[in-house]
Regions:
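Conserved N-terminal boundary motif of the eukaryotic protein kinase catalytic domain
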Residues: 2-17
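Catalytic-loop of the protein kinase fold
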Residues: 114-135
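Conserved alphaE helix
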Residues: 102-116
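C-lobe/activation-segment region of protein kinase-like
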Residues: 141, 145-228
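Conserved structural core of kinase catalytic domains
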Residues: 66-106
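ATP-binding glycine-rich loop module of kinase domains
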Residues: 13-70, 74
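Regulatory extensions appended to serine/threonine kinase catalytic cores
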Residues: 238-246
Length: 246
């Protein structure tokens, strides 16, 4: 993979695209390319040489370019690996979609793509609204690649923060204790869908039961939110596919 070299001073000329997560900032390197730069304080916790190798391995999996913003180039700042460049997409986050049928179609695609990614031994460890963009054809695009585990390499870190406001989405942390990452990611997607159904003006259960979801889907959503006996063996991808095609 091509490498770019910058001096720390040169970064001041780049516009800040957004503040990114706790681990770094995202800078606008070119109109279509972003630069993900890691903060120095997390360096002791990450094996950066390992991350560099992981990104090289990941760049070979170019089949997923329409789904994921792949790392394009490694970036060295003051002769130290400090980030990578990635493609900038003209898209909106899933929060911008209000139509229920479009949401069902989107989440059906998300579940299908998540299966595909997992079959490539890739784990999406940061499934949340701001990391999922939607293009003009209602196709999902995952944009957070820096936390992924690839093949024999583990994730660099695991976000152990709260799943979100209990008032808007279920507190799903307690449901994660005995699940593998694939199940966890599917539940995170289900949480996002439940959150999309909810609003602050109406109880979540009313919002679900007043929607045009099928009876089966409504019962699954209700059980997921309110029951500790949720059936984790449910084929959630099939549920969304049935909703999309019925």
């Amino acid at each position: 993979m091509e490498e770019l070299n910058f001096k720390e001073e040169e970064l001041k000329g780049f516009k800040e695209f957004n503040k990114g997560g706790y681990e770094g900032k995202i800078l606008l390197y070119k109109p279509e390319i972003l630069l993900k730069r890691f903060e120095s304080f997390i360096m002791p916790f990450l094996n950066m040489d390992n991350k560099k190798y992981k990104l090289i391995e990941f760049s070979k999996m170019n089949q997923l370019e329409n789904i994921i913003a792949l790392p394009k180039q490694l970036v060295n700042i003051d002769n130290t690996f400090s980030g990578f460049t990635m493609k900038k997409y003209n898209a909106v986050t899933i929060d911008n979609l209000k139509d229920l049928n479009k949401n069902i179609d989107l989440f059906a695609k998300l579940f299908k793509n998540l299966d595909y990614l997992h079959n490539k031994d890739i784990i999406i460890g940061d499934v949340k609204n701001k990391n999922i963009l939607v293009d003009n054809n209602n196709n999902p695009i995952f944009v957070d690649v820096d936390s992924m585990g690839i093949n024999k390499f583990p994730q660099d870190h695991i976000d152990r923060g709260p799943a979100g406001s209990v008032r808007r989405i279920p507190n799903i942390n307690k449901k994660f204790k005995s699940l593998d990452y694939k199940s966890l990611d599917k539940l995170l997607l289900l949480s996002l869908f439940v959150e999309k159904l909810a609003d602050n003006k109406e109880p979540m259960v009313n919002k679900i039961y007043n929607s045009s979801l099928s009876k089966e889907a409504k019962e699954i959503m209700h059980e997921y939110i309110y029951s500790d006996k949720f059936n984790y063996n449910i084929d959630l991808a099939a549920v969304f596919e049935n909703e999309r095609t019925r």
